[in-house]
């Protein structure tokens, strides 16, 4: 048999008995030849180890065991060295604490009635009976951590060695209606506990999808024609479908335009567009789109208001075409980052003249990983080599509500000048 490195497997009890100790093992399997060296590391001083002789005539197998005394969860590392194959590896095994105090975790939410105009929904995570000063609470949306400053943790009471705490998280109606799963993750005594929730179940017809789209910054601040769009997808036909609009303050509402489109998959979509007053929208007025049909168990209702949260102005950078690009074209890239909310408009100009939207492309806003709630996008403009070499100037213009008046920020680039300065200031409101 030729030299072969081992495989490592953790060994731990199937259940946590109410004993004063816990025993873990490290299985070292399918290696040749002897010997292997197994060493244990842990943050516990009260431990004992035992290494067993190897077995097997060809491929070898051995085990090593560690016993620890104490009531806290600990991480134990099995360090294995097999000199003949130069194999060195660590296997970390987490021991479940004995006599653990399991807290109770309840996740509740405020009213999720889509007929309500409130722009936020509150999630409450109650943790009862945890060890004092030994609890952390984190929020996740579809298993991704949510920006921590949106959460508020409050100690409710202390009873002897135990305490109770709750954490509150505000989310938008749009996040709630997206059917995402929200999770409260609680860590206590080194153990994790989860509670989950998602939007209230309702009687909306299966298959029919409805989106409510806010005004674009371009229409809101540049064109002065802000509008809401209610998009209804996957209908059998437009027959007997009604789309109506309602304002939160019950004031008069303008006339909406509506069109239907038949698609190749034999479904129909309806687009209803409602002009709104820019001042009303900026001040936080709420709107609803209601879609109904005689066969629906109840109307489909979508609500929208201006997104809550701290505003952050975008940073804009334009990049020169790559030198190795094909000889008959040049690609300009505009990076827009660190902005909130996600609603943003991007335009390209050539020598101060607007380039048609069909000639450039922009990604949808992407959210940063981790705790940052801000967004970034890329916009791409492809031009001919002739235009680029003629020292034409190309400008990436960004429109966003967090920018100072007139809510625009530009970055200009050309072959002869390179990157020019920003205009106007990118300072936030």
Swiss-Prot record:
SS bonds (residue pairs): 26-78, 125-184, 230-289, 334-396
Superkingdom of the source species: Eukaryota
One GO CC term on file: MHC class II protein complex
Chief place of localization: secreted
SUPFAM superfamilies for this protein: Immunoglobulin
CDD domains, alphabetized: IgC1_CH3_IgAGD_CH4_IgAEM (cd05768)
Domain Ig-like: start-end pairs: 6-89, 103-201, 205-305, 314-414
MF term (GO), any: peptide antigen binding
Keywords recorded for this protein, A-Z: Cell membrane, Disulfide bond, Immunoglobulin domain, Membrane, Repeat, Secreted
InterPro entries: Ig-like_dom, Ig-like_dom_sf, Ig-like_fold, Ig/MHC_CS, Ig_C1-set, Immune_Resp_Modulators, Immunoglobulin_dom
Subcellular location: Secreted; Cell membrane
GO biological process terms on file: antigen processing and presentation of exogenous peptide antigen via MHC class II; B cell differentiation; B cell receptor signaling pathway; peptide antigen assembly with MHC class II protein complex; positive regulation of immune response; positive regulation of T cell activation
UniProt cross-references to Pfam families, sorted A to Z: C1-set, ig
Subunit structure: The basic structural unit consists of two identical heavy chains and two identical light chains; disulfide-linked. N-terminal variable regions of the heavy and light chains form the antigen binding sites, whereas the C-terminal constant regions of the heavy chains interact with immune receptors to mediate effector functions.
Function: Constant region of immunoglobulin heavy chains. Immunoglobulins, also known as antibodies, are membrane-bound or secreted glycoproteins produced by B lymphocytes. In the recognition phase of humoral immunity, the membrane-bound immunoglobulins serve as receptors which, upon binding of a specific antigen, trigger the clonal expansion and differentiation of B lymphocytes into immunoglobulins-secreting plasma cells. Secreted immunoglobulins mediate the effector phase of humoral immunity, which results in the elimination of bound antigens.
Protein name according to UniProt: Immunoglobulin heavy constant epsilon
Organism expressing this protein natively: Rattus norvegicus
Gene of this entry: IGHE
């Amino acid at each position: 048999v030729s030299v072969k490195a081992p495989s490592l497997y953790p060994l731990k009890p199937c259940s946590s008995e109410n004993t004063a100790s816990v025993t873990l093992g490290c299985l070292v399997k399918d290696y040749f030849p002897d010997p292997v060296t197994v060493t244990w590391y842990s943050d516990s001083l009260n431990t004992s180890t035992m290494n067993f002789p190897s077995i097997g005539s060809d491929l070898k197998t051995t085990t090593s065991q560690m016993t620890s005394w104490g009531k806290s969860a600990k991480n134990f590392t099995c360090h294995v060295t097999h000199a003949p194959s130069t194999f060195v590896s660590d296997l970390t095994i987490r021991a479940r604490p004995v006599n653990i105090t399991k807290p109770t975790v309840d996740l509740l939410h405020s009213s999720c009635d889509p007929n309500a105009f409130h722009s936020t929904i509150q999630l409450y995570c109650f943790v009862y009976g945890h060890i004092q000063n030994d609890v952390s609470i984190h929020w996740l949306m579809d298993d991704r951590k949510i920006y921590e400053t949106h959460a508020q943790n409050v100690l409710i009471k202390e009873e002897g060695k135990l305490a109770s705490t709750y954490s509150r998280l505000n989310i938008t109606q749009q996040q709630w209606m997206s059917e995402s799963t929200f999770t409260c993750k609680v860590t206590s005594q080194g153990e994790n506990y989860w509670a989950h929730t998602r939007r209230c179940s309702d009687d909306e017809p299966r298959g029919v999808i409805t989106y409510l789209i806010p005004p674009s910054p371009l229409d809101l601040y540049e064109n002065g024609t802000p509008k809401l769009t209610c998009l209804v997808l996957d209908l059998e036909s437009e027959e007997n479908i009604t789309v109506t609009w309602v304002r939160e303050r019950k004031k008069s509402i303008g006339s909406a335009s509506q069109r239907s489109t038949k698609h190749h998959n034999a479904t129909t979509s309806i687009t209803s567009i409602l002009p709104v007053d820019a001042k009303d929208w900026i001040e936080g007025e709420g709107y609803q789109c209601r879609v109904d049909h005689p066969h629906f168990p109840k109307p489909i209702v979508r609500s929208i208001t201006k997104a809550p949260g701290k505003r952050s102005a975008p940073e804009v950078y334009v990049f020169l075409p790559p030198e190795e690009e094909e000889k008959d074209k040049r690609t300009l890239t505009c990076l827009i980052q660190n902005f909130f909310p996600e609603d943003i408009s991007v335009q390209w100009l050539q020598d101060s003249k607007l380039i048609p939207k069909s000639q450039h492309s922009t990604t949808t806003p992407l959210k940063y990983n981790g705790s940052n709630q801000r967004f970034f996008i890329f916009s791409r403009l492809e031009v001919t080599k002739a235009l680029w070499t003629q020292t034409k100037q190309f400008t990436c213009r960004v429109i966003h509500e967090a920018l100072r008046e007139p809510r625009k920020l530009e970055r200009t680039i050309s072959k002869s000048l390179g990157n020019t300065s920003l205009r106007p200031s990118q300072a936030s409101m």
